[in-house]
Amino acid sequence: MAKKLLLYPAIDLERYSQILDLDVDLNIINADSLEEAQFHITDARGFYGKITPELLTLAEQLTWVQSPTASLEHYVFDQLIDHPCTLTNMKGLFYDVIADHVMCYVLMFARRMHLYMRSQFESKWSPIGGENARSSFTVGPGAVTGMDQAHMHIADCTMGVVGCGSIGSEICNRASHFGMKVIAVDPDVSAEPCGVSELRGTNELPWLLAESDFVVIAAPHTPETEGLFDDAMIAQIKPGGYLINIGRGVIVKLAALSAALERGHLSGAALDVFETEPLPSEHPLWEREDVILTPHVAACSVRVPERHLDTLLENIRRFASDEPLLNVTNKARWY
């Protein structure tokens, strides 16, 4: 008898038809209602969608659950962690897209674009460092002006990446191609990402913070990373450094970040994710010239949806053929 794969909530007919076109020996159920899902989960071997404690309790033969998301902090629950089924996620979809977003932040800070855009909106010609600091032929070769000093040379900078999954690894790669020195920390130090000059364990995070001009958080939301960047941790960032978070909003305490910016410990911050989303309009970060805020769009690209579908189709094919699945997670660690 063919293994049963339950899809719930039901996916749209166009994507469902592509699953049916896989030519695999599976009984695929696209459940339109909770009642239908409850009926079919009892003997389903595979599941795609949003599993709940109620559905999991009814499952008697379940061996595989495919999350529709890469992040798992809102997906896993105690019963699922304890269940013997394999949980796979959708990691690996956004690596280049988010890395580009990070490098955009870095370039904006280094070339002061975040400030020049404000000047443009006000129709102001305001070179940072002052117009009177502009180089002229009366100044001899080798003289560094205030205008020069006000703009960063990226190849002289160090980027520290916190978390070297698919996204963090590609950030390291992109940064190295800009000539930056790249260091990183990750729980797994067995494989050094391309472009990284030194990879250490997460216990060496203070070392990374002290050495980096740009600290990039590319870590997932886990019990260990929640609230990790508090007052004490942010205080360990190199004075004048920049903090970039494209990982998860709950990793950075915004009150602590705001305080560090206010006292001048950090030169700036760029955030795509926040403790509360949307970020309230009255939050003080909106008004800061040294902050770049984007509304959780770092992963947006026309390529991501097709990769999402391709990953699902490939895992369904592997499930039907009893082959090793892609993106097997550690349920207890949420990634």
Listing of model-derived features with the role each one plays in the protein:
Residues 183:
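Conserved beta-strand positions in the Rossmann-like core of class I SAM-dependent methyltransferases
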Residues 168-169:
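N-terminal Rossmann-fold NAD(P) dinucleotide-binding loop
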Residues 240, 246-335:
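Rossmann-like dinucleotide-binding domain for NAD(H)/NADP(H)
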Residues 99-118, 176-180, 310-318, 323:
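Oxidoreductase and adenylate-handling cofactor-binding alpha/beta cores
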Residues 1-91, 230:
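An N-terminal-biased, well-structured beta-alpha scaffold segment characteristic
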Residues 187-284:
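Rossmann-like adenosine-cofactor binding region
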Residues 85, 91-158:
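Phosphate-binding beta-alpha-beta segment of Rossmann-like dinucleotide-binding domains, i.e.
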Residues 164-165:
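Glycine-rich Rossmann-fold phosphate-binding loop(s) that bind the pyrophosphate
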